[in-house]
């Protein structure tokens, strides 16, 4: 074991926001204080919080109906509300743009097979391709809408 060094509180907050966005992306229905763990990186001598997933409670495959964390407007899965809550942070916008640029569900499925050696059954692959394809479309559309709203606000302020 090793002694953990102090971590920057700002970094922990950013990671938590990113993980909360991911939970929203996968429609996590079992988000609670018990579903978090600590990952230790012995090489870098650091730790970070990480979500723990019950696979039957995300990607619309589960039946649990528990309380899900909401955004300031009370929504559970709407990306627009999440973007409005955190869109004033430059690092957050950069992160979202990287997600949009790098998203490739087919590559993720292939990487899963390469890393685990397990072939995902066709019907399950199709479910995830459809689910993540739809969520990505909603994600990207909501982000573009927020950007357009921000540009419109700036233009209105310039006119005044």
Role assignments for model-derived ranges:
Residues 1-64:
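Conserved kinase catalytic-core segment
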């Amino acid at each position: 074991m090793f002694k953990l060094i102090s971590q920057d509180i700002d970094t922990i907050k950013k990671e938590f926001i990113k993980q909360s966005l991911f939970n929203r992306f996968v429609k996590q229905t079992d988000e609670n204080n018990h579903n978090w763990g600590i990952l230790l990186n012995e090489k870098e001598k650091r730790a970070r919080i990480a979500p723990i997933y019950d696979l039957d409670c995300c990607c619309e495959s589960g039946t649990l109906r528990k309380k899900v964390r909401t955004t300031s407007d009370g929504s559970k899965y709407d990306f627009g509300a999440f973007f409005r809550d955190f869109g004033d942070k430059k690092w957050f916008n950069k992160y979202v743009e990287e997600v949009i640029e790098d998203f490739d569900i087919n590559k993720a499925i292939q990487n899963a097979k390469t890393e685990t050696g397990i072939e995902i059954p066709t019907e399950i692959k199709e479910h995830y391709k459809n689910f993540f394809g739809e969520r990505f479309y909603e994600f990207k559309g909501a982000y573009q809408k927020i950007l357009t709203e921000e540009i419109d606000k700036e233009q209105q302020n310039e006119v005044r």
